[in-house]
UniProtKB/Swiss-Prot annotation:
The protein, known as: Peptide chain release factor 1
Entry GO MF terms: translation release factor activity, codon specific
UniProt modified residues of type N5-methylglutamine: Q237
Any one Pfam family match given in the protein's UniProt record, by short name: RF-1
UniProt source species: Anaeromyxobacter dehalogenans (strain 2CP-1 / ATCC BAA-258)
Length: 370
């Protein structure tokens, strides 16, 4: 059974949901576009929790009703009740765990769009080829979710591979899903260039950063040095006759970003500034995380971007996420963007972890009050 404290929190959310529902029918709110959108957004953010709470109550009522029938004089009713209870009782614990997860505080960045950086790591040309496949995997996943993807910068490698690429992904709560992708992705397979049929191991590093608005990060124009150059293709050849590509250097931190995908220098500069703000925002987020908890030094997982988070084993057609001990097969589907189950496994794992940490914090606070 859920503890009284948990039920109290859930009931408070339900009460707030009812208040917001009433507000939406208030003419004063309906006539104010900004306020209406704000109220509707807050209501939508807790609707799933309220729906789950009401379904949980109905489940308990059904269990209680069938348990009462076990004492009925009619043997047929007793048998039907037993069959119903065999179906209902196993649903109680998972429903309670899901409700607890809904109480985990949301990451304030979850609603943000993201910038994704993909870099070939160890493994030479094979790493570049896998980097290109990982990039395509995210593009296909974004398409499945109805998100918009823009290629901001890319550096081509041999055999059609990619040394590094930068993407922006825009849509509904993109960061809440893609934040689990930061880290080292390892691939094990026989490269196309391997004549002996030996399995090679290569790596690709992925960094996912929430986009930062100007209100999040203030950049002093005097701190930014801009260089312009001609855009180059995958083989290094110039593909533009004007200096439209832009490179920005943030002098205080040494961060360098570049964008050459647009024909307009102004558009490239705007996109490069977006990348720079995201990187500076990530640095500030990292500083705050380190200050709160020295053992947590990245967005997710146990450490920084050098953490090996996932292995793609092609000979065994198996993907393993090492952080959450999750395994699945059918790698062709994975590389075609079918990764929602992996992301869901990560989300559930880290939400449960956050809930445990919050519970320990509340228990400690209660002890101090006592």
């Amino acid at each position: 059974m859920l503890s009284p404290d948990v039920l109290k929190k859930l009931e408070a959310i339900e009460q707030r949901f009812e208040e917001l529902t009433q507000l939406l029918s208030d003419p004063a709110v309906a006539g104010n576009g900004d306020r209406f959108r704000k109220v509707a957004k807050e209501r939508a953010s807790i609707e799933q929790t309220v729906t789950a709470l009401r379904a949980y109550r109905k489940l308990l009522e059904d269990v209680e009703g069938n348990e009462a029938l076990l004492a009925d004089k009619d043997p047929e009713l007793r048998e039907l009740a037993k069959e119903e209870l065999a179906q209902l009782r196993p649903q109680v614990d998972p429903a309670e765990e899901q409700l607890k997860l809904y109480l985990v505080p949301k990451d304030p960045n979850d609603e943000k769009d993201v910038i994704v950086e993909i870099r070939a790591g160890a493994g030479g040309d094979e790493a570049g080829l896998f980097a290109a496949e990982v990039m395509r995997m995210y593009v296909r996943y974004a398409e499945r979710r109805g998100w918009r993807v823009e290629l901001m910068d890319t550096s081509g490698g041999a055999l059609g591979g990619v040394k590094e690429a930068t993407l922006t992904v825009s849509g509904d709560a993109v960061y809440s899903s893609l934040k689990y992708e930061s880290g080292v992705h390892r691939v094990q397979r026989v490269p196309a260039t391997e004549a002996q049929g030996r399995i090679h191991t290569s790596t690709v590093t992925v960094a996912v950063m929430p986009e930062a608005e100007e209100i999040d990060v203030q950049v002093n124009p005097a701190d930014v040095e801009m260089d312009v150059f001609r855009s180059t293709g995958s083989g290094g050849q110039s593909v533009n006759t004007t200096d439209s590509a832009v490179r920005l250097t943030h002098k205080p931190t040494g961060i360098v970003v570049k964008c050459q995908q647009e024909k307009s220098q102004l558009k490239n500069r705007t996109m490069a500034m977006k990348m720079l703000r995201a990187k500076l925002f990530e640095i500030e987020q990292e500083r705050q995380r380190s200050a709160r908890d020295a053992t947590r030094k990245s967005q997710v997982g146990t450490g920084d971007r050098s953490e090996k988070i996932r292995t793609y084993n092609f000979p065994q057609d198996r993907l393993t996420d090492h952080r959450v001990n999750y395994t699945r097969h059918n790698l062709p589907a994975v590389m075609d963007g079918d990764v929602q189950d992996v992301i869901d496994a990560c989300r559930t794992f880290y939400a449960a972890q956050a809930l445990r940490e919050a519970s320990r914090g509340e228990a400690g606070a209660a002890e101090r009050r006592a």
